[in-house]
């Protein structure tokens, strides 16, 4: 398999279609365009449209009886809805890597932070602790799991200085991940698990998941090679 890097803005002007495309951008419009031309895309449009929007993710999972942390959605520019939970976490629907995620510890902070949001957002109950587990999935296969823990921050993102270590999933966690996999045709994603009321719940599904944590904790896994093997068998 040979590859070439094509920027999103150049896709529309190209006349030739590739045999397949790996879209590493949060651009459902580009994925939709490629699929309309008959190009197999990894990840596909359903994954891109749902998983790059936290409100859509939580709504879709909840509709399919997949547990998530209690949440509501809100629109920027409107009066903030009454705080459903205090403390609570506010997240931009299209945020990535912990960017724009803020914690409101009381009602006054909530009103101030909600008023500062510049795009649609979700309001979520604060999880039991700052750790979560990212599960790397190719297709319907669990590749590996990495625990992340915030360092002086309620956010656990590796890019924000969180500590990471490899871990084994429990049977309950595996069952949860496989239940999510049945709802999608994934290429490569990261599914984030947190705990609520003593049980695992889904926090996010990362469409354009990065692999630095995986490389840091699982030296024996070549995620790119495994992903390419999966793509080749899928075509």
Model regions and ranges:
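Conserved N-proximal alpha/beta basic substrate-recognition cap immediately N-terminal to
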Residues: 1-71
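Active-site nucleotide/adenylate-binding loops and adjacent lid/helix of ATP-dependent enzymes
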Residues: 38, 46-132, 170-171, 235
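Phosphate-binding site of ATP-dependent enzymes
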Residues: 101-184
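Anionic group-transfer/hydrolysis microenvironments
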Residues: 26, 72, 93, 126-127, ...
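A short beta-strand motif that forms the metal-chelation/ATP-contact edge
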Residues: 18-20, 88-91, 135-137, 199-213
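A long amphipathic alpha-helix within ATP-dependent nucleotide-binding catalytic cores
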Residues: 155-202, 214-217, 224-235
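Short glycine-enriched loops at secondary-structure junctions
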Residues: 26-28, 47, 142, 148, ...
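Glycine/Thr-rich phosphate-binding loops of Rossmann-like dinucleotide-binding domains
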Residues: 30-31, 98, 199
């Amino acid at each position: 398999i040979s590859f070439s890097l094509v920027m999103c803005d150049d896709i529309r002007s190209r006349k030739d279609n590739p045999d397949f495309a790996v879209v590493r951008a949060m651009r459902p419009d580009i994925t939709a365009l490629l699929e309309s031309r008959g190009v197999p895309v990894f990840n596909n449009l359903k994954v891109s449209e749902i998983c790059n929007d936290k409100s859509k993710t939580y709504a879709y999972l909840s509709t399919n009886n997949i547990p998530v942390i209690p949440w509501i959605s809100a629109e920027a520019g409107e009066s903030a809805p009454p705080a459903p939970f205090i403390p609570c976490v506010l997240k931009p629907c299209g945020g990535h890597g912990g960017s724009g995620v803020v914690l409101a510890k009381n009602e006054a902070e909530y009103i101030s932070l909600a008023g500062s949001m510049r795009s649609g957002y979700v309001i979520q109950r604060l999880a039991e602790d700052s750790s979560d587990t990212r599960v790397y999935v190719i297709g319907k296969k669990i590749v590996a799991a990495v625990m992340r823990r915030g360092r002086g921050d309620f956010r656990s993102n590796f890019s924000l200085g969180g500590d990471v270590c490899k871990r084994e999933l429990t049977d309950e966690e595996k069952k949860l991940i496989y239940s999510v996999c049945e709802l999608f045709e994934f290429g490569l994603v990261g599914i984030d698990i947190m705990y609520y009321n003593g049980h695992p719940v889904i926090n996010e599904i990362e469409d354009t998941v990065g692999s630095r944590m995986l490389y840091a904790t699982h030296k024996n896994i070549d995620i790119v090679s495994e992903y390419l093997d999966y793509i080749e068998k899928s075509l």
